Regions:
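The feature captures the beta-strand-to-loop junction immediately N-terminal to the Walker
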Residues: 57-60
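Helix-to-loop junction immediately C-terminal to a conserved catalytic motif
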Residues: 72
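ABC ATPase NBD Q-loop/coupling interface
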Residues: 81-95
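Q-loop/switch helix immediately C-terminal to the Walker
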Residues: 111-128, 139
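Conserved ABC ATPase "signature" region
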Residues: 120, 135-152
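Hydrophobic anchor residue at the start of the ABC signature
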Residues: 170, 198
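ABC ATPase C-loop
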Residues: 173-174
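Catalytic Walker B motif of ABC-type/P-loop ATPase nucleotide-binding domains
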Residues: 181-184
Length: 218
């Protein structure tokens, strides 16, 4: 199952790591909307390997976000199937949703807190109830390093630039250590230099942190 192979030996159930990351496959994703039954997804088949960084590119209204929502399992009103390492996502969504991260186009952060405070309160919600303060602090340090915001940890969110706020939103989702990571137009409104920096960070996450990353962009 996902990164593990279950082996039953007499009275013991063993778990063996067999792969890193999550591979995603779509089979015949199809969706129609409206009274005219306009086709938004037309039997989409694709395969994304584990730890790949993939961009879904297209113009406005092309169905990019619709496809991503179908891939993530959050849109149930889609024909076809999605498999994560061979496991049907729709049939096992409640068990698999914890490994899925999603960053919407609108930043998901509280602007009247410092970055560290915001991450701390978010960690209290996202991490298990028995997580210690030391473990939370260690996780915050880790995600700050991942998104290259360590030097801004005591900065109020409202004083951050657009690119920094986007990285803060990504840090929020990284607290739960998702293996499959979706981002909706993360570079929207960013200048070319900031966009390049963000793309470099995302590429690094996929290569060094065992994350499969799928983003939507124009």
């Amino acid at each position: 199952i996902l990164d593990y192979r279950m082996i039953f030996a007499e009275k013991f159930l063993l778990f063996k790591t067999v792969a890193k990351g999550v591979a995603l496959e779509t089979r015949n994703l199809h969706k129609r909307v409206g009274k005219q039954k306009k086709v938004i997804l037309n039997h989409v088949n694709c395969q994304i390997e584990s730890n790949e960084f993939v961009a879904i590119i297209g113009g406005s209204g092309a169905g990019k976000t619709t496809l991503m929502n179908a891939m993530s399992g959050f849109d149930k009103d889609v024909q076809g199937a999605v498999f994560l390492n061979g496991i049907n996502l729709r049939e096992n969504f409640q068990h698999l949703k914890s490994i899925i991260g999603y960053v919407p186009q609108q930043d998901i952060i509280y602007e009247n807190l410092t970055l560290r405070k915001m991450l701390y309160y978010t960690a209290k919600l996202k991490m298990s109830a028995d997580t210690t303060r030391e473990e939370i602090d260690a996780k915050i340090e880790e995600v700050l390093d991942m998104v290259e915001l360590k030097e801004h940890e005591n900065t109020y969110i409202r004083k951050m630039s657009g690119g920094q706020k986007k990285r803060a939103s990504i840090a929020v989702e990284l607290l739960a250590d998702p293996k499959l990571f979706f981002l909706d137009e993360p570079t929207s409104g960013l200048d070319p230099g900031t966009e390049k920096n963000l793309m470099t960070i995302l590429s690094k996450l996929s290569k060094t942190k065992d994350k499969t990353i799928i983003m939507v962009t124009h």
